[in-house]
Amino acid sequence: MPKQAEYTWGSKKILDNIECLTEDVAEFKDLLYTAHRITSSEEESDNEIQPGAILKGTVVDINKDFVVVDVGLKSEGVIPMSEFIDSSEGLVLGAEVEVYLDQAEDEEGKVVLSREKATRQRQWEYILAHCEEGSIVKGQITRKVKGGLIVDIGMEAFLPGSQIDNKKIKNLDDYVGKVCEFKILKINVERRNIVVSRRELLEAERISKKAELIEQISIGEYRKGVVKNITDFGVFLDLDGIDGLLHITDMTWKRIRHPSEMVELNQELEVIILSVDKEKGRVALGLKQKEHNPWEDIEKKYPPGKRVLGKIVKLLPYGAFIEIEEGIEGLIHISEMSWVKNIVDPSEVVNKGDEVEAIVLSIQKDEGKISLGLKQTERNPWDNIEEKYPIGLHVNAEIKNLTNYGAFVELEPGIEGLIHISDMSWIKKVSHPSELFKKGNSVEAVILSVDKESKKITLGVKQLSSNPWNEIEAMFPAGTVISGVVTKITAFGAFVELQNGIEGLIHVSELSDKPFAKIEDIISIGENVSAKVIKLDPDHKKVSLSVKEYLADNAYDQDSRTELDFKDSQGPKERKKKGK
């Protein structure tokens, strides 16, 4: 008979409104119990697995966008296909893969898994197990980031810009894709990042190579190197790991101002080893030593006095360099450019690129110097200067320059003489030549002296006439009365111009026999005066005059003139009254 059966399942009650046999009810009860036990076991298992764990799962479905993985939890995880790119070749249904548990259950009750995080975790565990700071690892530079590059060493590591290379870096992109060895500088466990260096390995390799090369290298050996740096004093070459200096003086037998005239960066050169300092790790290189030294037989080839033809290659304030053959230059000093001109700048005579003839003056083989002369190719006009301009010769010359001490005149092109200020006038005290002469004017003068060695000629103008002071005693003996014009008034007297331009002085004490306050009260410039010569001093060119003595000698005439002048000063009426 059908009956209503009531069953309990823990705290739950199940009511079956069905008819069944007693044995069927017992079997169904067992099935329900088994299902309950399995479900409880899965829930307990889910609670034991924590996010962050790496699980093994089975691929149960694959499409172009996702991979479905069963890790034995209550739901399957869906992982983007992009996370399987590196291992997509072995990705098939049923394949076993490791995944990272992000979440055991999201908002929708699904398991969240990651293949990429699992891979990174395993890489990090490998690094910690097998590497430490200072370890050498191999990796590939994958991309450029701010401040440096990212390197794949099994996981991503940071390569700072300062640790990329041991030479100057122009473009970081040039390093992307390169596979190199790196040294681990720092491992940060908390942040899970690694800093590596390529530069330290390169530097260590360079030092090792340098030490090895220093031991192997020998003087006189030929080596190839690449120009890595150019300075004012020379060129540094990379000799396969060791730096060598090619000094500017060892680059060429010619004169160069800067190494860049001969070489450029990254240029390969074959050089000769000149010296090796093993203690300091320095190598001196030579380039010119590979060629014949043109200075070896220079003294035979260019003896002093030989005339040479060359090209002006350089002008400097003190002279001009002339190249007389490849690698051989000589200096024409500014003092050797002209016999007669005072050259201030070489460009007054020659220009760069000019071809000129010169005479070899001297050679300093050890110093690599040749002195040349340009003026020596012409006759020296001073050689016969004494015959051409004998003392006493009268000449007409143009005034070229005026100075405080005299006037320079040109006797012929390049030959000048000096008229000293003391040789300009016998009688006039000249303060400056411009009082008598003007630049550009012609003047007649007489040759006074010629100094061939120092190239000096002196002339005189006053010597064209006799010295009036030699005849002064005859012209103006003491006691003579003279007349002259007042030319200058000073505090001590008045100067009067006499015959032939000679000046005499009326001292203030000799101006009058009457008292006066100022000289100007009794005499003025331009006034004609009469005076008596009271003293002559030809050696010192002085003539002393006296108005007072002149007046005393002519007292009567002076008194008469004074009385007459007084009468003339009275009016006719006054004189008439006086007469009454």
Curated annotation (Swiss-Prot):
Binds mRNA; thus facilitating recognition of the initiation point. It is needed to translate mRNA with a short Shine-Dalgarno (SD) purine-rich sequence. One of its GO terms (cellular component) is cytosolic small ribosomal subunit. The keyword RNA-binding applies. Belongs to the bacterial ribosomal protein bS1 family. This is Small ribosomal subunit protein bS1. One of its GO terms (molecular function) is mRNA binding. Residues 52-116, 134-199, 220-288, 305-375, 392-462, 479-548 form the S1 motif domain. Pfam families: S1. The keyword ATP-binding does not apply. Keywords: Repeat, Ribonucleoprotein, Ribosomal protein, RNA-binding. GO terms for biological process: translation. InterPro entries: NA-bd_OB-fold, Ribos_protein_bS1-like, Ribosomal_bS1, Ribosomal_protein_S1-like, S1_domain.
